[in-house]
Amino acid sequence: MSISDLMSVLMMIFLFISIVYMRSVNLEKNKITSIAQTYETTQVEITNDLKKEFTKNLQIWNAVLDSLTLSIRFENPEILFNVGSAELNDHFKSILDSFFPRFIQILTDPKYKNDIEEIRIEGHTSSEWAGESSPYQAYFNNMELSQDRTRKVLEYILSQIKDEQLLHWTKSKLTANGLSSSHLIYNPNQTENKERSRRVEFKIKTNAEQQIIRILEQSK
């Protein structure tokens, strides 16, 4: 075999390897694209169902549906808890009695149920604390308070579920997260909006990210 023939064979082998590699890359890319599209579709459909279910209630509850973060945010601190307290106000309990069963019914619909990774209850506070606490101490005081509050919300809504299968599924997805003042809400002039920063959010996380990570790991 001449050198030119050998080079031709090597080039063919290299070309074949390149084609196989590119095909593999394209397959993985298509899988990830498909998951991303499915995630986007699922997020839009969940948002639309939440809007349809709660549009008439959100303003009454002083709540906001955020389609970007897939969350419902309760923003009126006066109806949530007493100042400095983790105990739920009766009015907030009545809101949760109306909100959560309908909320969880949407998420346990067969078209969404297997896509739900986590339902986060997030407690947020302003940066201030009563007295002359330093900003550092105020942060940790508010961290403890926000954690206590989300735990109380978690305890209350779970106590209202009587169906054992639904309770088991909800417990496997629901988490309580106290975040103190780490995610403040700001006014247009970039000053802290202390009232709106004090809030409770129910945030939905789908498993699209985990599916993409699994594909990437399998492709290594």
Describe each region flagged by the PLM.
Residues H124-I213:
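Periplasmic OmpA-like peptidoglycan-binding domain that tethers envelope proteins to the cell wall
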Residues S85-R120, L154-S159, F202, Q210-K220:
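Periplasmic peptidoglycan-binding/anchoring modules of Gram-negative envelope and division proteins
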Residues F54-Q59, Y112, L167:
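Short secondary-structure junctions
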Residues I60-R73, E117-I119, S126:
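Short edge beta-strands and adjacent turn/loop segments
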Residues L68-D97, E128-N141:
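Short, solvent-exposed beta-strand/turn patches at coil↔beta or beta↔helix junctions
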Residues M1-T55, S67:
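Short terminal targeting/anchoring segments
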Residues I35-T42, G84-I95, N141-R149, K194:
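Extracytoplasmic/periplasmic, Sec-exported soluble proteins
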Residues L65, N114, W169-T170:
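Short, glycine-/polar-rich solvent-exposed loops and beta-turns at beta-strand/coil boundaries
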